[in-house]
Amino acid sequence: MAIMFATEVSIPLRESEQAIRLPAGVLELTEEDLFEFCRSNRELRIERSAKGDIIVMPPAGGYSGFQSGEAFSQLKIWARQDGRGVAFDSSTGFRLPNGAMRSPDATWVELSRLKKLSHQEKEQFIPLCPDFVIEVASPSDDVSGLHEKMKEYVECGLHLGWLILPATTQVEVYTVEGVETLSSPVTITGDPVLPGFRLELASIWKPPF
């Protein structure tokens, strides 16, 4: 697998590798260029930091893919039944107020905020910070980097964020009040930001395969 550029240059990327960071200036990408770059590399998860660095993350392994998918699936089912907002998976990019572009494992945005966006804004990276995000750490992730990313979300307007750490069966809860660490929770609730949402963690801690 390789990262593809418009000039047909490619960078090999193996599934076991950590993310590749391309410092700002290596790739001079406009918003439109970045969107097309991501479309040309759909199999990869690509983000941009507030400083302009491009971060390319390898495909998830089996366990990590299941764990993040399980978190999104539960959020999606609840959001559809609740009707007050929309859930998005990691294929959706969000352009944050600080200039970063992030694609959390699972997100929820209040419907009224989305309805204010133009058709073009909805077609490309969504220009707002989600109300709620879930990030699930994989073995290749830099956990300290995930901590910084969660803090970035809060600084950009996030109301509630969960960083799920399967390796230690912990969940870090991020709000404007600070960070709370939960050890081996069986469930976690989204109240009051997502009233009624409950994430069941048993299958995330121990996948059924």
Residue ranges, per PLM feature:
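Gly/Pro/Ser/Thr-rich low-complexity, intrinsically disordered segments predominantly at protein N-termini
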Residues: M1-F209
